[in-house]
Amino acid sequence: RRLELYNTETGKIYRSFSAPDGTEFSVGFIHSVNLSPVTDVFVVRNGKIYADRTVYAAFGAGVESTLAPGETLSYDENGNMVVSGFGTVFPEVKYIVGTVYDHVLVIRGETISLTALCGRNAHVAFRLA
């Protein structure tokens, strides 16, 4: 199984990664409203992409402030808030690459600037193939 990063407007595949079950990947960015770091973490399980957790550096406008049923709030070793327990499956995970701040992909020990790879304002998505 492969995780593909592609342009949703043109279909161009930017990168493809080996993604067996248990593969974790994350996309980090600076939130456009409260201007603090956010990291969305996903995991491949049973051939699907699951939202695993989101790491917030600060509460503020535009970030989750209440927990839905089943979600939990904890803190990591750096004092960041970690919301987990989503259980949400995504056929695709979509982003618009930042025009001011970068989006950074971390997968299998590799850190990749989406601005450098895809370009600013690129409409991208991750999918399993």
Specify the residue positions occupied by each region the protein language model found.
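Membrane-interface motif at the C-terminal end of an N-terminal transmembrane signal
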Residues: 1-4
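N-terminal secretory signal peptides
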Residues: 6-56
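Mature, soluble, non-transmembrane domains
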Residues: 62-129
